[in-house]
Amino acid sequence: MEQYETEEQQVEAIKRFWKENGLSLVIGALLGLGGLLGWRYYNDSQIEAKEQASFAYQKASEELKKGEMGFGQAKSFIDSHSDTGYAILMALEMAQQAIERKDLVEAAKQLEFVVINAKLSAVQSIAQLRLARIQIEQGEFELALTSANKVSDQAFKGQIQEVKGDVYLSQELFDKARAAYSAALETNNRDQVLKMKLDNLAVAANG
């Protein structure tokens, strides 16, 4: 997967991929299978269902952006399209909205749905790391470490170490925090936030 500096960029890239390629992938798959099995095994309703799911996702996403009033429609969308990639994207959006409203319980619930149901490793990793950060905010440090350790995708190695550093810092385990932040910085030495965390860590450790 192409490298992105932040999880937000990763999520936006995935959303763009689905919007731009979701239907074409379905059509392409049908064309390929049609050459082997014949179009008689497939009908227009399959493509139509994908189009409807895409339209419903766009509509629910727009309503969700309007605030809490759109939360119910977003939940209904997930219930109706739980077996599609659009449900995963909607859950990620709902989690972000919940975080902005300081509803960490709801945010964690949506992220857990993504972790369980997402088919792509990158999406699972994003959700798992966001869940770990929420658990830090809730003071659930051991759970946060467990969540971070569940991420096996090496593309997220730096973010895993950063989350661990945040946990250790919250626990005032300064040596472990420094080691984790340093390991994270090795994967992206341009990350100014990580550099700032290391600088602040030195102050905290001496305080």
Regions found by a protein language model. Give the residues of each.
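Alpha-helical tetratricopeptide repeat
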Residues: 50-62, 88, 92, 125, ...
